[in-house]
A protein has these predicted regions:
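Multi-pass alpha-helical transmembrane bundle typical of ion/small-solute transporters
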Residues: 1-336
Length: 336
């Protein structure tokens, strides 16, 4: 039989492990294009991404509020000490599988799926916050890649119009410098959205265990989540960088600038609205959009099929693992 305080420590550690895998998996999105175009070395890019993720993570808590209370109803799950741990097991499992195979699926989808599966296992459909999950979670997750695709097209068209008289080598020299700024904006927006998701999960656990009385993200939660994500970026992001930066479309600095700027705008706006979106979906869609403006054959559309399968499977797969994990933990710990 587990003591409740020990279980809370385990949950917080599991959440930070998820954040670490998120850094290894999703934070590569912030630096994939700037590394693949050789504007920055991997070491410099990782350092920049880590610093700006830390800053971004401290800029708000709206996304954390949505993740903590917009998926599972706090009034229903408040008595379940194992729910958050089961959700994290589902998310971490799927993240690990897709990371191993170098597939840029969505950690956001994995976390949402894990929470949904564990909540359903605990109390059925009554545990799901139906009204909030549609408007603040499902629609943004669907619309953000569509917005990213068309923003990528629009950004590239505007750049082509503004610089059409400039020779490509000269333009690329300019955008090599500009891409440092766009990569920084992408890293900042990533911290604003993705780091807050784990903050929301940990804060929900603190609320369930009675460590806090109202849903408010403590400063130590913000800092530890930001640091865990930065460490994950440094350790494991390069498999995803290769897929994002080379396999989809052969990127030049101008393309990297357009894709990063477009993605940063979409993700930043979503963060200000408190919408947890997929940074993976968004930057990938931006790269597809940018590539499509050159010529359709320049984009390796075959990659899209593999990515689409992973994206479609992520929520149900992580929900299934989250639900099974809940029942296993319930049996092992004797808790609910």
């Amino acid at each position: 039989m587990f003591e409740v305080p020990l279980l809370l420590v385990i949950i917080v550690l599991a959440a930070l492990i998820f954040d670490f895998t998120n850094g290894a998996h999703d934070c590569a999105n912030a630096i994939a294009t700037v590394v693949s175009t050789k504007v920055l070395t991997p070491r410099v890019a990782v350092g920049m991404a880590a610093a700006l993720n830390l800053i971004g993570a401290l800029l708000g808590t709206k996304v954390a509020m949505t993740l903590g209370g917009g998926i599972a109803r706090p009034d229903v799950v408040v008595g379940s000490h194992i729910l958050v741990l089961a959700a994290l097991v589902g998310a971490i499992s799927w993240n690990s599988i897709t990371w191993y195979f170098g597939i840029p699926s969505s950690s956001s989808h994995a976390l949402i799926g894990g929470l949904m599966g564990a909540a359903l296992a605990h109390a059925g459909v009554d545990a799901i916050n139906g009204g909030s999950i549609l408007g603040k979670v499902v629609l943004p997750l669907i619309l953000s890649p569509l917005g990213g695709f068309f923003m990528g097209i629009l950004a590239m068209m505007l750049i082509n119009f503004a610089f059409f008289k400039l020779a490509r080598p000269i333009a690329n020299r300019f955008f090599k410098k500009a891409q440092v700024l766009s990569a920084g904006l992408m890293a900042l927006s990533h911290g604003m959205n993705d780091a807050q998701k784990t903050m929301g999960v940990i804060t929900l656990a603190l609320l369930i265990f009675g460590e806090i009385e109202v849903f408010a993200v403590p400063l130590w939660v913000k800092l530890t989540c930001a640091l865990a994500m930065a460490m994950g970026t440094a350790v494991g992001g390069w498999k995803i960088v290769r897929t994002m930066g080379h396999k989809i479309f052969k990127l030049e600095p101008v393309h990297g600038f357009a894709a990063e700027t477009s993605a940063a705008m979409v993700i930043g706006c979503a963060s200000l609205m408190g919408a947890p979106v997929s940074t993976t979906h968004t930057i990938t869609a931006c790269i597809f959009g940018v590539g499509a403006t050159k010529r359709l054959s320049a984009v390796r559309w075959g990659i899209a099929g593999n990515l689409l399968i992973a994206w479609v499977l992520t929520i149900p797969a992580s929900a299934l693992v989250g639900g099974i994990s809940f029942y296993i933990l319930e049996f092992v710990t004797g808790l609910h």
